[in-house]
């Protein structure tokens, strides 16, 4: 039992890193809507759509992360501008964060048809960082430890670039550009945000007339904790059913001497499916299962998402949106 408590505490510390830094919420269905990691993705689908997801991580472990997010995005100016609004709430143990971001993307046409675009995006919003002191070491509290909920609201910004055509895509983005500089020293127990960098790319490979293969990757780094790599692959059947998964692990991208040498990678695998019952609705589900110390202690991670697309008859989409 003691070993389990130490293990869970260590996992939380890797994600939370109290006082000095805060890790962004983790989720597995970012490949279904890139707006969650890149503001330049706004307008990519070239139609008004609403997307929401809920993630219950490490089911069965008390205080494990839970994340709820909703986004809406659309195009303007003949498709040359993308607009998006995103609202998120994330809870991990005693930590609770909420955020609202508005994103703007300028989408440069790279060919006459407009099927190839290079987008530059920026997002601005506010983040509420909170900590429930009642959940922190209640037996032997520290002198400055809050007795109840303590929070601070700070401004923030994010930026990114996203390229796509009908065969492949690539993107780079960074968040927490402003909030990292806001002084929250008066609230010593509130984790301070720090920038997260996202690099992603993927391609589309036809296997037959009705089956496509979509491999992709996501590299995430915060210049503090371990660098995370996701390797993804999906089979697409007739544009209606997506079946695939991911493998997530830590990689040594560059030397981080401040990390302990025997830090466990906390590898995990993801099985996911995405369904399109009709042209307006998309439903997704992902199940993450740990490969490592948490295996056997957690019942896995469940994540569900849903989207609704408002079709505009005035706009003719030249190619389906796979990215």
Spans of features found by a protein language model:
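Positively charged n-region of N-terminal signal peptides that target proteins for export
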Residues: 1-4, 110-112
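Sec-dependent N-terminal signal peptides
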Residues: 4-13
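Short, flexible coil/linker elements and helix-boundary hinge sites characteristic
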Residues: 13-14, 104
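Sec/Tat signal peptide C-region and signal peptidase I cleavage site
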Residues: 16-21
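Subset of outer-membrane beta-barrel
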Residues: 22-323
């Amino acid at each position: 039992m003691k070993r389990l408590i130490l293990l869970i505490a260590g996992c939380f510390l890797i994600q939370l890193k109290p006082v000095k830094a805060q890790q962004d919420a983790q989720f597995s269905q970012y490949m279904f809507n890139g707006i969650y990691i890149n503001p330049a993705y706004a307008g990519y689908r070239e139609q008004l759509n609403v997307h929401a997801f809920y993630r219950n991580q490490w089911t069965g472990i008390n205080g494990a992360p839970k994340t709820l997010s909703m986004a809406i995005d659309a195009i303007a100016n003949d498709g040359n501008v993308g607009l998006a609004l995103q609202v998120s709430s994330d809870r991990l143990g005693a930590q609770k964060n909420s955020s609202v971001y508005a994103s703007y993307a300028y989408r440069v046409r790279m060919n006459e048809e407009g099927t190839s675009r290079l987008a530059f995006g920026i997002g601005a919003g506010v983040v509420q960082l909170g900590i429930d002191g009642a959940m922190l070491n209640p037996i032997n509290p520290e002198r400055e430890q809050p007795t109840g909920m303590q929070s601070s609201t700070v401004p923030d910004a994010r930026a990114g670039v996203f390229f796509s055509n009908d065969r492949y895509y690539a993107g780079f983005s960074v968040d927490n550009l402003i909030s990292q500089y806001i002084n929250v020293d008066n609230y010593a127990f509130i984790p301070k945000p720090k920038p997260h960098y996202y690099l992603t790319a993927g391609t589309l490979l036809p296997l037959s007339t009705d089956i496509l293969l979509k491999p992709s990757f996501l590299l995430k780094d915060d210049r503090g904790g371990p660098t995370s790599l996701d390797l993804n692959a999906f089979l697409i059947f007739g544009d209606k059913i997506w079946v695939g998964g991911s493998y997530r692990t830590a990689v040594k991208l560059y030397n981080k001497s401040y990390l302990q040498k025997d830090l466990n990678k906390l590898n995990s695998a993801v099985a996911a499916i995405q369904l399109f019952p009709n042209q307006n609705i998309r439903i997704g589900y992902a199940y993450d299962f740990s490969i490592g110390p948490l295996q056997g202690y957690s019942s896995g991670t469940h994540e569900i998402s849903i989207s609704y697309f408002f079709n505009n008859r005035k706009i003719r989409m030249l190619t389906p949106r796979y990215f």
